[in-house]
Amino acid sequence: MGECIVLAENLTRRFGEFTAVDHVSFEIHAGEIVGYLGPNGSGKTTTIRMLLGLLEPTEGRATVLGFDAFRQTEEVRTRSGYMSQKFALYDDLTVYENLAFYAGIYGVRSKSQILETLNRVGLSGTEQEITRG
């Protein structure tokens, strides 16, 4: 088995009284091919978003490629790739955070470029609004 490249220990995420992810722990080692399966609403996307530093866990810790997923988010994101099964806005992120996330997939990290894009499409001033999907 190769080195551990993803480590999740007791990852938990609650939204109010609802527990979306409940103390999930696993390891992924270099060279492994992994399928992360489960029914709709089982917490798969929430877990992936925590591993990418897009969503902070209520409890637990995770490392990706040796970086703390919650304290070294930029290092994790620049070394990771993620594509959603279908395009959708994340309803708990702001307009800016949603655009920055998808822009980052394509290597665009410039805040000024993202803000200019918002201005160009008439969304200037909405950067901090939650999208609500």
Q: Which stretches of residues belong to each language-model region?
A:
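Conserved ABC transporter NBD signature motif
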Residues: G60-D68, E75-S80
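Helix-to-loop junction immediately C-terminal to a conserved catalytic motif
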Residues: L52
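Conserved ABC ATPase "signature" region
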Residues: A100, G104, K111-E127
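Short coil-to-beta microelement around the adenine-binding A-loop and adjacent beta1/P-loop entry
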Residues: F18-T19, E74
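Short hydrophobic beta-strand immediately N-terminal to the Walker A/P-loop
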Residues: V34-Y36, I48
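Walker A (P-loop) phosphate-binding loop of ABC-type ATPase nucleotide-binding domains
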Residues: P39-G43
